[in-house]
UniProtKB/Swiss-Prot annotation:
Region entry Disordered, spans: 56-75
Transmembrane segments: 32-49
Tissue: Expressed in liver and kidney, followed by heart, brain, lung and testis.
Disulphides: 288-300
Keyword Glycoprotein included in the entry's annotation: yes
Gene3D superfamilies the UniProt entry points to: P-loop containing nucleotide triphosphate hydrolases
Membrane topology: Single-pass type II membrane protein
EC numbers on record: 2.8.2.23
Protein name according to UniProt: Heparan sulfate glucosamine 3-O-sulfotransferase 6
GO molecular function, one term: [heparan sulfate]-glucosamine 3-sulfotransferase activity
Keywords: Disulfide bond, Glycoprotein, Golgi apparatus, Membrane, Signal-anchor, Transferase, Transmembrane, Transmembrane helix
Organism: Mus musculus
Gene name, Swiss-Prot/TrEMBL: Hs3st6
Amino acid sequence: MAGSGGLGGGAGDLQGAGTGQGTALRALRAPLALVVLLLSAYCLFALPGRCPPAARAPAPVPAPAEPPHTSLRLRAPGLPVASGPGRRRFPQALIVGVKKGGTRALLEFLRLHPDVRALGSEPHFFDRCYDRGLAWYRGLMPRTLDGQITMEKTPSYFVTQEAPRRIHGMSPDTKLIVVVRNPVTRAISDYAQTLSKTPGLPSFRALAFRHGLGPVDTAWSAVRIGLYAQHLDNWLRYFPLSHFLFVSGERLVSDPAGEVGRVQDFLGLKRVVTDKHFYFNATKGFPCLKKAQGSGRPRCLGKSKGRPHPRVPEAVVQRLQAFYRPFNRKFYQMTGQDFGWD
């Protein structure tokens, strides 16, 4: 009987313990669910490098019978323009770089041209979303008529190792536009953008030099992007130099019509976008587009364009200029252009 009583007491203890554990688990369930919800939201919205949601892309279109790439030349004068909404095509031209070089400005200026149709957002297909496939990528593109050029811009392509090979696989005839800027001012602008989104960031100097005092830290992306010659070496393994146009980010500000004119020539377009389309906004220190007929006001780029840069000590600037000088000179030799950064 004593044994029976002992077993009975043990069962009671287990039942009580089970009840206590169930209560504790129920008490933990709500905060655990909240943690999971918050982590899911963070992964969805905060983590970098995400592809555009597939649901936002139009349904993939079947491959056309003819080659997807049309000539960059304009249609002959007098020929009728194809009627209807047109077709989605792979881009014949890409703005592949560089970040904080002036790529958004160039794209907006080119969109004034009636024979240019450009995707407004950056699809990041050849760096982040390649596994979604070419049909998905083409489905993102705006519809174009025969004789119009499809374009997109994603500045990170220029510094992505796999991008040249992937773009060449899409079409070896792709025209490539690279907007470059003094790598020192580009790095400071890059830092300013990051600082605006991440208050409390270490100083520019602390990030640019190892331990703030040592050699230049090329592991920091703001520094590494400016090694233009190294990145171009990778691209020239797949495309000849004749497929590139290098646009000066500085001249895009001081002479937008001149630089956009060079781009129109490169694409085989008539020079439709000219100096009559621009005016200089002294407040922003940046060119803006004059208002179109029927429009209430001129168009300037977003408020982030022309944001003031943080003050960087002159000694830091000089050290970076000295670091970039040999890379700049090699880039001048490779492109046949002197951008005047030294």
